[in-house]
Amino acid sequence: MSNENDDLSPQRRAPRLNERILSSISRRSVAAHPWHDLEIGPEAPSVFNVVIEISKGSKVKYELDKKTGLIKVDRILYSSVVYPQNYGFIPRTLCEDNDPMDVLVLMQEPVLPGCFLRARAIGLMPMIDQGEKDDKIIAVCADDPEYRHYTDIKQLPPHRLAEIRRFFEDYKKNENKDVAVDDFLPPNSAVNAIQYSMDLYAEYILHSLRK
């Protein structure tokens, strides 16, 4: 007959913890942050990495939680519109609103939030959101055979541009928030805006290191 204390035998092995669990417990390592740890790419500012926050066709407004690096649910859109294309940000960039540079990426399929891809800038959409500058880079997926040949926003069908403009003009109307979209600008304006945001980010890092 077995002894009730057999289960408490000192010879019984404890479950093994892998290195990831151990490092998390000891807090000796930190998970990669998509804004700061992912490189922008060797061809930037023309071709660059984009971290997708919101999938094409989604009504959920996801966004980067800057403290944790995770993608969080910000809100559900108040109107019936959905995001016309995949939407995200360029790592290692910084804009005047203290956020990374926003990008709308045209491609065939929706991409899961948190994934990253290579994109090419084809234009810039100047935008004012509630009185503050909030420009968007318009880009195409550099590895999508249907879109990678586009190099200028003027090459897009007029309906596609109207769709993008109307989405951003309307998506906050039911929240009583004003958004104004100006005329689309050419690729060089987008490239210059990205380079400026890269320079701002570099200054931010240098300032942080001096503290």
Curated annotation (Swiss-Prot):
Say which species the protein is native to. Answer: Solanum tuberosum
Q: Which InterPro entries match?
A: Pyrophosphatase (IPR008162), Pyrophosphatase_sf (IPR036649)
Domain of life assignment: Eukaryota
Q: Does the keyword Transmembrane apply?
A: no
Essential cofactor(s): Mg(2+)
Binding residues for Mg(2+) 1, per the UniProt record?
97, 102, 134
Q: What is its main location?
A: cytoplasm
State if Metal-binding is listed as a keyword: yes
Q: What else is known?
A: At least 2 separate genes code for soluble pyrophosphatases in potato. This protein is probably encoded by the Ppa1(a) locus located on chromosome 12.
* Active-site residues, as the UniProt record annotates them: 83 (proton donor)
- Which residues hold substrate? 61, 75, 87, 171
Q: What reactions does this protein catalyze?
A: diphosphate + H2O = 2 phosphate + H(+)
Where is this protein localized, as stated in its record? Cytoplasm
* Gene Ontology CC terms: cytosol
Alphabetized, the UniProt keywords read: Cytoplasm, Hydrolase, Magnesium, Metal-binding
Q: State the protein's name.
A: Soluble inorganic pyrophosphatase PPA1
Role according to the record: Catalyzes the irreversible hydrolysis of pyrophosphate (PPi) to phosphate.
